[in-house]
């Protein structure tokens, strides 16, 4: 999904015909979405479109969302989050590699019992960032918006982890890094995968 990378093509042979898919389309055909970059408007639009497509194809079958992302734009991430909450499908979320910031919120937002971290995944939480500069009034407006985003992120994480908003707020004061087991104890995921992805996916 990054233009500078060579995207592999997969050939599907049905016995009568052959069809070529790029690897992400092939995954989508198997109800798998891979969020593997910093979250911006473009990536969010792609993920939202895929979620809506899979929901239209089958409103009950599970969707798998694999996340390897340093986070990114909060507004774009919330577009993905709200879509995840709006559709009827159960969504299995997978932490792969690094899942940070907004990526961590999306990880926690998966269907209860179906939030999984691979054994060497790293999960990271931190407050909404961004320097403020300009006229005093502008700085105050920017600060209020950052505070609103922080409060919203904390409320969402409290909802999905079972932690209190106060605990989340305290942990948001500094960067917090977790391994897979720590993330499970915190309530960000339900399982740490010690078996094959196929075995966990089949539940």
Predicted regions and their residues:
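N-terminal organellar transit peptides
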Residues: 1-104, 108-203
């Amino acid at each position: 999904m990054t233009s500078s990378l060579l995207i592999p093509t997969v050939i599907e042979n049905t016995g009568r015909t052959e069809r070529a898919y790029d690897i992400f389309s092939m995954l989508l055909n198997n109800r798998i979405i891979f969020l593997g970059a910093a979250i911006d408007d473009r990536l969010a639009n792609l993920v939202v479109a895929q979620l809506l497509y899979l929901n239209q194809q089958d409103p009950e079958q599970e969707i798998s969302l694999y996340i390897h992302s340093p986070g990114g734009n909060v507004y774009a991430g919330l577009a993905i989050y709200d879509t995840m909450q709006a559709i009827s499908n159960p969504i299995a979320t997978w932490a792969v590699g690094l899942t940070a910031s907004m990526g961590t919120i999306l990880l926690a937002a998966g269907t209860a019992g179906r939030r999984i971290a691979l054994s060497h995944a790293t999960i990271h939480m931190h407050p909404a960032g961004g320097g403020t500069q300009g006229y005093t009034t502008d700085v105050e407006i920017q600060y209020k918006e950052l505070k609103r985003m922080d409060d919203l992120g904390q409320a969402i994480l409290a909802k999905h982890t079972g932690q209190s908003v106060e605990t989340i707020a305290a942990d948001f004061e500094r960067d917090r890094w977790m391994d897979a087991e720590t993330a499970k104890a915190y309530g960000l995921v339900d399982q740490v995968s010690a078996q094959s992805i196929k075995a966990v996916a089949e539940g």
